[in-house]
Amino acid sequence: MKYLAGYPAPLLEQVRQLLAEDKLGALLGKRYPDGVHDIQTDRALYGYVTELKSEFMRKAEPLSKVMFDNKLHVIRNALGTHTTVSRVQGGKLKAKREIRVASLFKGVPLAWLRMIVVHELAHMKEREHDKAFYALCMHMEPDYQQLEFDLRLYLTHLDMNGRRLWDASSRP
């Protein structure tokens, strides 16, 4: 249960029991009955991210690229990345910011996509995963901690069973 490292032992025991009884998937399915969101393209993701950014981080630098990345989870063991590329243009240094979200998020509920987008947007202001970072995440998404935990449960479910709970191809 690598995704749940650092959580208290009694909580981990509850998760082990849910896994043993094959009830973890059903629990998550009940919690997120709406299923998969309809943000399936890079263009739609860019629109969604810039909408959240303009709502909560108007003064932050603009994003030059936002995209789903097929290789992200496998290569970097990450679900999202934020990068800043600096280039010399004329006599000035110009920075381009981009956010990449693992393609896994095409097939999950909107709440989890929002959680990872909020996480990556928070990195535009706070580099480290510290108290200020999580306070910013909680400001943008009040249920951030629960959503992150539920996503970790889902990743554990995928790791143990290999079965997705929602199918992106059957969304409304």
Sequence positions of predicted segments:
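Walker B catalytic acidic pair
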Residues: 120
